[in-house]
Amino acid sequence: VHWTAEEKSAITSIWNKVDVPAVGSEALSRLLIVYPWTQRFFTSFGNLSNAAAIQSNAQVKAHGKKVFTAFGDAVKNPEAVKETFAKLSELHCDKLHVDPINFKLLGQILITVLAAHFGKEFTPHVQASYQKLVSVVAHALAHRYH
């Protein structure tokens, strides 16, 4: 995948302002609320019975932070996403058996959350750049499945 200087700049200009724990928590919470079947991968997280329980769940918050800290590695080095996520792809495929469509869903939710947080700053160009990045990350995470 070729990345232009403009795409990289658009991505980092927003990501440098992201509160990763807050955005990670919100994005993972939204995934579990909007797509409730994804909750089956998080049964060890305790109470996920409703939106309020999910949004206040400490394990959801911690895992959201972990997921989007890892996503930050893709932001830092978009040319090496496949290598960066090789072990996570193996984990999610071989051990957790996560359907790869869920990676795409979480990427779309991240875009929604960033747009909500950054408003007018999240221009169509920024959105297109993030769309490309979340697609590349989702593909890398699904790599082990092919």
Curated annotation (Swiss-Prot):
UniProt-listed CDD domains: Hb-beta-like (cd08925)
Residues involved in heme b binding: 63, 92
Listed GO MF terms: haptoglobin binding; heme binding; metal ion binding; organic acid binding; oxygen binding; oxygen carrier activity; peroxidase activity
Source organism, top-level taxon: Eukaryota
Cell inner membrane listed as a keyword: no
Keywords: Heme, Iron, Metal-binding, Oxygen transport, Transport
InterPro entries xrefs: Globin, Globin-like_sf, Globin/Proto, Hemoglobin_b, Hemoglobin_oxygen_transport
Start and end residues of each Globin domain: 2-146
SUPFAM superfamilies documented for this protein: Globin-like (SSF46458)
Tissues showing expression: Red blood cells.
One of the GO biological process terms: hydrogen peroxide catabolic process
One GO CC term, this protein: haptoglobin-hemoglobin complex
Family assignment from sequence similarity: Belongs to the globin family.
Cited function: Involved in oxygen transport from the lung to the various peripheral tissues.
Quaternary structure, from the entry: Heterotetramer of two alpha chains and two beta chains.
Name this polypeptide is given: Hemoglobin subunit beta-1
